[in-house]
Regions:
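Hydrophobic alpha-helical membrane context
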Residues: 14-15, 95, 294
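Hydrophobic core
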Residues: 9, 13-17
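Active-site-adjacent loops and short helices of periplasmic peptidoglycan-processing enzymes
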Residues: 21-206
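Domain-terminus/edge residues, biased toward the C-terminal soluble/receptor-binding domains
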Residues: 172-176, 184-403
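Hydrophobic alpha-helical membrane-insertion segments
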Residues: 11-12, 69, 92, 255
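Positively charged n-region of N-terminal signal peptides that target proteins for export
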Residues: 1-4
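A generic local structural motif
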Residues: 9, 42-44, 254
Length: 403
């Protein structure tokens, strides 16, 4: 027995440096299925919706998948739908901590003189960022847009430069902004496709904006200024979460509408509708088509525990394995039963491992086609066995051997 113990101890001491300092490399990248704004070729444009608007698009918010199009790249005047980008930049400035909701924003002479829809700000009048956002989202206040642009960037011109830079970053290749509010100006144009892109960025990554865009009626200035939402779908369409209307004599009637039912969030954009009513009818047709024909399956949730596994040379019995991010799969209704998952672990997984270190991947398939994936991570730091761990095992082994 003593000889066996001495032999095992010698092996432990010889191998211990290797155990302590072993280094393993893992790939960070994973295959993605939802390349934003990628056409879902199997199901888009299968029906004719007979839309009255000149241009339109229906997009799944979660994946960016396009579900229906009509002249989606036609460059048209956006009118106040321009404000989707203005609102996006405001929300991003809030996220970065550059401004706060309670900050007071002054109205300049230029902002006061803005025409079109407004709340009639007086020069030097101060409203909070929260109040400005409410006025922009609910009644499309041009004066508040200019005041916010000056507050964030120093001038509307500088702010518009940021709008165009952000549009380029988002891949909005049909777009050129000339102002922050959407009043007609030669060359100020975009497309239904690009509006869907920026609407998705705003709605998906800044869901707090829905607290403003779903307001039907409210007030400012201690109740003296009544606000009624220009987007009638907020009141009359089940699940509507926003987003922005726009109209001028040249642009006619535009709308970017967002809605959510169950786990499916949709973006419907219509441009150059002949009348206000027809734009809302067209958006309703698009949304109805989407909700009737598609579903979004949450296959894997972020940080979901998939299983517990043993790790070679680990000082603990088992380790929880979690997912890195959500995996949502958009599919035609009835196809949910054809979704399956497959877990693949990296080769030679050994301790030590850092907390949330990647050790594998979970692939998600729809009709045997890879459509989604996320990394598998360890849910704790995993240390290598040390000499004391081996000694403890040795003692247990020796005890069992001697019985």
């Amino acid at each position: 027995m003593k000889k066996i113990i001495c032999l095992l101890l010698s092996i432990i001491f010889i191998l211990s440096p290797v155990i302590s300092f072993a280094i393993f490399e893992y790939e960070d990248s994973i295959p993605t299925w939802s390349n934003a704004i990628e056409t879902f070729a199997k199901i888009q444009n299968k029906v004719e919706l007979n839309l009255d608007s000149e241009s339109a698009i229906l997009m799944d918010e979660n994946t960016g998948t396009i579900l229906y199009t009509k002249n989606e790249h036609s460059k048209l005047r956006p009118a106040s739908v321009t404000k989707v980008m203005t609102i996006l930049l405001i929300m991003e400035a809030l996220d970065r901590g550059e401004i706060k909701l309670e900050d007071k924003v002054p109205c300049s002479e230029r902002a006061r003189k803005m025409g079109g829809s407004q709340i009639w700000l007086a020069e030097n009048e101060m409203l909070s960022v929260h109040e400005m956002l409410k006025a922009i989202c609910v009644v499309s206040a041009n004066d508040c847009c200019v005041a916010m642009s000056e507050f964030i960037s120093g001038s509307e011109e500088a702010f518009v430069m940021k709008m165009n830079e952000r549009a380029k970053e988002l891949g909005m290749n049909d777009t050129l902004f000339k102002n922050c509010h959407g009043i007609d100006e030669d060359g100020h144009e975009t497309s239904a496709y690009d509006i869907a892109i920026m609407s998705r960025e705003l709605s998906k990554n800044h869901p707090k904006i829905h607290e403003y865009t779903t307001i039907w009626m409210d007030s400012l200035r201690d109740g003296k200024s009544e606000l009624v939402n220009t987007n009638k779908l907020v009141r009359f369409y089940s699940g509507c979460t926003g987003l922005k209307t726009g109209s001028t004599s040249l642009a006619l009637f535009n709308l970017s509408a967002t809605a959510k039912r169950n786990d499916l969030s949709l973006i419907a954009v219509v441009m150059k509708g002949p009348t206000s009513g027809q734009r809302f009818n067209d958006a309703t047709r698009l949304l109805d088509f989407g909700f009737a024909n598609f579903s979004n399956s949450v296959v894997v949730k972020k940080e979901q525990v998939m299983e517990k596994i043993k790790i070679e040379k680990a000082n603990i019995e088992e380790v929880e394995i979690i997912t890195e991010r959500d995996v949502n799969i958009l599919c035609a209704k009835g196809d949910e039963k054809n979704i399956r998952t497959e877990i693949i672990y990296d080769e030679n997984i050994k301790a030590p491992l850092e907390y949330r270190e990647k050790i594998g991947i979970i692939n998600c398939y729809l009709n045997d086609e890879l459509v989604g994936a996320t990394n598998l991570l360890v849910n704790q730091k995993v240390k290598s066995k040390n000499i004391m761990d081996f000694l403890n095992e040795l003692i247990i082994f020796s005890y069992k051997l001697g019985r």
